[in-house]
Amino acid sequence: MKMKVIAMLAALSLTASAAAAQELPRKVNNVEVLDLDGKPTKLPYWGEKNLMIFYVDPDRHKQNNDFTVELEENHRAQGDNIYGFGVMNLKDAPMVPNGMARNMAKKRTAKNGALVLADQDRILSKAWELGDCNNQFVLMIVSK
């Protein structure tokens, strides 16, 4: 009987925490992550434009590849009122060294002109209460 109560309480607490993480929309604050050279930087155009942010796990960088390539090649995530960019979730990619992931992103952005930033310590996912982003391709819209 005690085990059933404990299991039910554990399930309830997990459900409640997951539900809290999914409550939208909510106010978020700008965070400081790293540029591809490893220097601290804030998210661009904060409060100036609507932002389309791709929060990507480098272990699973091919998720939604067709969608991402379409946006990059046709600059569909850029305009007078919107700016799109990527943030690599490096903490959840332990098999990919941070420097290697940043160098791969540098090569890709040199070709397509996109902006990619690096989050080495889940700063963005913690600050914005995104929950578990491991192996996920998270697309976020942040309004100005």
Task: Enumerate the language-model features and the residues they cover.
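Short active-site neighborhood of thiol/selenol oxidoreductases, capturing the structured segment around
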Residues: K42-N65
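Bacterial N-terminal signal peptides that target proteins for export
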Residues: M1-A7
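Structural microenvironment flanking redox-active thiols in thiol-disulfide oxidoreductases
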Residues: H61-T109
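Short, internal strand/loop/helix patches
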Residues: F85-V87, R102-N135
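Bacterial N-terminal signal peptides
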Residues: A7-T15
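Loop/turn elements at helix/coil->beta-strand transitions in domains of secreted/extracellular proteins
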Residues: E48-L51, G79-Y83, K111-G113, Q136
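A short, hydrophobic beta-strand/beta-hairpin element that forms part of a small beta-sheet core
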Residues: Q136-K144
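N-terminal "domain-start" segment that seeds a small globular fold
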Residues: A21-T41, K62, D66-F67
